[in-house]
Amino acid sequence: MAAGAPPSSRGGPVGAHDAQVRARIAALAADGTVDAGAATATWRTACAAAPWTGAPVWLHGDLHPANLLARGGRLAAVIDFGVLGTGDPACDMLPAWTLLTAASRELFRAAADVDDATWLRGRGWGLHLGLGAVHVYRRTNPVLAATGRHAIVEAVADHAGA
């Protein structure tokens, strides 16, 4: 499907980021930002999901609200192609946790038509990038930090409700 295309830095196994995610969970739990137990359980489930075995597919890799432009309540454009490449489509499930709520997430999942393992890995990407946004931006960019907090809350709640 994407033969010869460059791999995305976010197209590999979500579990490859285990050390960084666990360190961020610990750091953010220390100041009360996250529940370490719930976040770790969410992360473990994502890492235990079956890996992507299909052909690499094109992916944006950074589909969070600041990169999704809307007009009249509808998606009008996608911007910031800095991590564009190929790999596991799970990373592009990111809007399910960075943008949506439980009710709208179900509609997104149905439209995306992905298997359970891809969804679980996608949830892991949501948690990972949410933790990263809070860690990096909480003092400098309140909008991205809020997106990160939303992703963490939604990923953990989605895991708890699964």
Model-predicted segments: where are they?
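Active-site acidic catalytic loop and adjacent metal/ATP-binding pocket
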Residues: 43-93
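A general alpha-helix detector
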Residues: 20-24, 92, 133
